[in-house]
Design a protein with these regions (language model features):
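Catalytic Walker B motif of ABC-type/P-loop ATPase nucleotide-binding domains
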Residues: 170-173
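Conserved ABC ATPase "signature" region
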Residues: 77-79, 112-115, 120-140
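Short coil-to-helix segment of the ABC ATPase nucleotide-binding domain corresponding to the Q-loop/switch region
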Residues: 101-110
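Helix-to-loop junction immediately C-terminal to a conserved catalytic motif
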Residues: 61
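The feature captures the beta-strand-to-loop junction immediately N-terminal to the Walker
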Residues: 46-48
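A short, proline-enriched helix->beta-strand linker immediately N-terminal to the Walker B motif
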Residues: 164-168
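Conserved ABC ATPase signature
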Residues: 145-149, 153
């Protein structure tokens, strides 16, 4: 499924100082961005720190709302859809793992709150978790906690967690950092 971004813009308002005066102007993180990703293609966004790469990913997955513009998955306008209804898996730069949960439970976490027809049995959840863990070669680490893993292993947990819901779109922010 192709992804199309049309005139995508994200502005963050200026922050006020303690005395109520503005200490800077509005920040335009993404400005009139037009882009098309063909179906089945893997692409990378390259640019210097602060140029809007992560903001663009957060707009695509729905964690941020665009100031202007549209986002299409195939023919569907997903601009107004909440993140949970977009079918996007997101791997964040900082992994966002739950330190008190095992690797298995971290991967399983997004499956726990599925509702209605999407709700899975415990057996199906376990099967999906094992498949995702095998895919990223961490199936031997399922009983460990995140603090027992290397940075690369933690990133693999985050990737497996994003894959376990079988997303239509997979977004990775800084995907090669810490991989071993």
């Amino acid at each position: 499924m192709k992804i199309v971004l049309q005139h995508l813009t994200k502005k963050f308002p200026a922050r006020s100082s303690v005395r109520g005066r503005k200490n800077r102007e509005d920040v335009i993180a993404v400005n009139d961005f037009d882009f098309e990703i063909p179906d089945g293609k893997l692409i990378g966004l390259l640019g210097p720190s602060g140029c809007g790469k992560s903001t663009a990913l957060n707009l695509i997955c729905g964690l941020l709302k665009p100031t202007e513009g549209k986002i299409f998955f195939g023919e569907d306008d997903v601009t107004g859809l909440p993140p949970e209804n977009r079918g996007v898996g997101m791997v964040f730069q900082n992994y966002a793992l739950y330190p008190h949960l095992t690797v298995e439970k971290n991967i399983q976490f997004p499956l726990e709150n599925l509702k209605g027809a999407d709700k899975l049995s415990k057996e199906e959840m376990s099967k999906r978790v094992l498949e995702a863990a095998k895919l990223v070669q961490i199936d031997h680490l399922l009983e460990r906690k995140p603090n027992e893993l290397s940075g690369g292993q933690q990133q693999r947990v985050a990737i497996a967690r994003a894959l376990v819901k079988l997303p239509r779109v997979l977004l990775l922010d800084e995907p090669l950092s810490n991989l071993d």
